[in-house]
Structures are given as C-alpha cells and as structure tokens.
Design a protein with these regions (language model features):
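S-adenosylmethionine/decaboxylated-SAM
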Residues: 38-41, 45-49, 60-229
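Membrane-proximal basic amphipathic "stem/tether" segments
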Residues: 1-51
Length: 229
C-alpha cells in the first residue's frame, strides 16, 4: 500500500526586524532615493551637530536652506563665527558650487562673553573635519576694519558678532552697501534677551529691507531689488 502524499510544509515566516534596524534601513533608503537637498541636509547635520554654538533648533536648517538656495557663484558674509557651527551650516549649502562663506571674526573672543580666548584652531579643525575648507574663507579681524576695505558683492549677510547696539549697527551699515539688490540680510539673537540686536533690527534694519520675517530669534529680509532702500 503506497504512502499518502503529505502537503508541503509552508515556509516559516521570518520574525520581523527589530525597530532600530528597520529605521536604519529606512534612512539608508531615503539617503539613496530622496531629494538631493534632503540627503545633503542629513549628512550635514550629523557632522556639524557636535560643534559648539548658540543656534536655536530650526535656525541651523534656515542657514543651510538659504545658502543652498543662492545661485552660484555667490558670496556669503558671516560676522561672528566662533567655532564654526553656523559657518559649517552655511558652507554645507555651498557644497559642489562656486558659492563661498567669508567668516569674519577675531577668533579671540572677549573677557565678557567667553571663558577663554583664541579659538581659531578649533574653528579650522571643525571646518576641515566637515570637509568644507574649500567653501570657507576665514577673515581674521574686526568686522569694522574688514568693512573698510571690502570690495565684493554680498548675496547673504549674516550678522552675529558683538551684540552691543553700536556694533550691530556698525556691522549693518558697513556691509549693507555691498549687499546685492535682492540679497538677504539676517540678524541673529533679535530677542528681549539681547537688546542690541533687537533695537538695531526694529529701529534700522527692518526698515531697509523687504519681505521681512523671522526664524525664532533670527530676523531676516531682502534688500530691495531697486537698491534704493
């Protein structure tokens, strides 16, 4: 008597992957298939986030997106760079283009706001580690001295140096004539905690700009296309 054939054993369903592995695979998939700007941002943030600085959440992405949106070539002037956190977010938006960030700072701090002096070496190490050296030109000196001999058009001006009212105003007045019509001007720390930038923005800067807006304590606008403001 012949044996009765048995139905084939159904394949065993593999157990689900742990959540952390599924998330990692999702990130890899997005890195390979997502929009280029999103891929660049994810790579940018993980490299730059360890750098010390005072940007609020969301302002890092604003700097990156704004630099990324500029046509190439373009000149970005940053006044106040410290250890390079904001510098690197700006420069990451320049990767693969002819855009450049001019990072103006004494890199020596002061006795009031910093616990130590001379952080140029750490700034340089951070920029190099992020692979952004070709997009960053450090300009060592006071912003007022640099403004006296500046001769390049500026397409994005980011003011985040001394927060004394007179100094913020000096930075604005010194570089605003070089901002190209339609160029962007941004001031950091426009908040009640910092009366200098707050006063300079509300009394002077915002009245010389159009399309003004805020990203938390970062206030910005565009120089009128006519260049008459």
């Amino acid at each position: 008597m012949s044996a009765v054939p048995q139905p084939p054993t159904p394949p065993r369903t593999p157990p689900p992957l742990p959540r952390r592995i599924r998330l990692k695979l999702k990130r890899i998939y997005l890195d390979l298939t997502g929009p280029r700007v999103e891929r660049e941002w994810r790579r940018t943030w993980s490299l730059i986030d360890p750098i010390e600085g005072w940007l609020m959440e969301g302002q890092d992405r604003w700097l990156f997106d704004t630099a990324y949106s500029l046509p190439s070539p373009a000149n970005i002037v940053e006044i106040g760079s410290f250890k390079g956190r904001s510098t690197c977010f700006l420069a990451s938006g320049c990767r693969g283009t002819g855009k450049r960030v001019f990072a103006i700072d004494t890199f020596n701090g002061n006795d009031c706001d910093f616990g130590y002096r001379d952080f140029f070496e750490e700034f340089s190490q951070n920029v190099n580690r992020c692979g952004l050296s070709e997009y960053v030109q450090p300009v060592v000196g006071t912003s007022s001295d640099v403004a006296k001999t500046w001769n390049k058009p500026v397409h994005l001006l980011f003011i985040d140096g001394s927060h004394r009212y007179e100094d913020v105003l000096s930075d604005f007045d010194g570089f605003f004539p070089h901002v190209a019509p339609g160029g962007i001007v941004a001031l950091h720390d426009v908040s009640e905690a910092w009366p200098g930038p707050l006063r300079a923005w509300h009394e002077i800067a915002k009245h010389r700009l159009v399309d003004v807006s805020h990203c938390l304590s970062l206030a910005y606008g565009r120089k009128p296309a006519s260049g008459t403001a």
